[in-house]
Each structure stands twice: as structure tokens, then as C-alpha cells.
Amino acid sequence: MNWGLVMQDICNVRCDAIVNAANKIMLGGAGVDGDIHHAAGPELVRYIENNVPTIGVSEADEAVPIRCDVGMAVTTPSFGLQPVCKAIIHTVGPVWTGGRKGEAKKLAKCYWSCLDEAKARGFKSIAFPCISAGCYRFPTNLAADIAVRSVCSWFKRNPDSDIKVIFVTYTVADNEAYENIMPYYTGK
């Protein structure tokens, strides 16, 4: 398994695909989602509106179409992010509500779905933010542990894969969470 950890803006990480911690409507939002949409440009929203089918409507507002549900992965071109990356893999992480509603399992599914998507598309490298740790209030240490554990378990089920995984953090605290947990899974 080939992986790394960097502290920088995910929009500047050179790789085949960056992962967007998206919302269900996929049209941009706060945090990483907003940053990626801003960097990709308005073509990304137009592409999503015209090419990504809706799978339902919001429970809060039936006029709001859902294009990606929790744990799913949807790939789009990267538009303004090229040549930094070829594609954006959007996934919707769970909102933290205390840990009693299957949030950990749902978060793990995000990583597995993104890696499955990367493998299916022949990508050789993928950059992950700490999904759900920002606006969705997942405790950073737990989110980092689930991220690393999920990636390790995916590679155990896909030993032939040579995808490079890059964990991308924005803050020193986030970076330290990964630095503290990664040795438990690498034996170093």
C-alpha cells in the first residue's frame, strides 16, 4: 500500500482524482466542497446539473434534487483543476450526531466507494480530505482513524491495486490526528 500525508489545499495536490466532501445536491457548499467548486469553476455545476441524474429529493424541500447520497461516490471531470487533477470524486459523508446512528460505518463506506470508483476508472492516485470532519462535525481523531482504517481494509480486499492514497489536511490539529494514527496501521 502506497500512501502519504500532506497539509495543504487539496486543490493543489497533483494526482489523478481529488475527493470532494460534497453535499447531497452536489452543487457546492462550505469547506472543502466550496473550495473545490470555486477552483473547478462554473463548468462543474453546469456539468452536474446536466449529466448527474437525480436519485431523489430532499426530505426538507422536495424542490431540491439529491444526486449523491451518504456513502456513494460520483465522478466528474475536474474542469478548472486541470492539469492538477483529472477528475473529482464526490462523496457525501455522514453528519455526526453522537455516533449512535451508524456514522462510522457510513463514513467508511465513503472511502471504499471512492477507492472502488478510482480503481474502476484506472486512476493511479487519489487525494482524500478528512471527510465529515469539518461542517459535518465528525470528531477529527475518529474521522482520521476511520479514514486510515478504511483505506487499509480496502487494500486488503484489493491487494492487486497500486493506487497511491494521499491524505490531505488543512490544519495542524488535523495533520497531527493522521500522524498519530497512521503508525498503528503501518507498523512504523
Segments predicted by a language model, with ranges:
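Macrodomain-like recognition of ADP-ribose-binding/processing modules
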Residues: 1-188
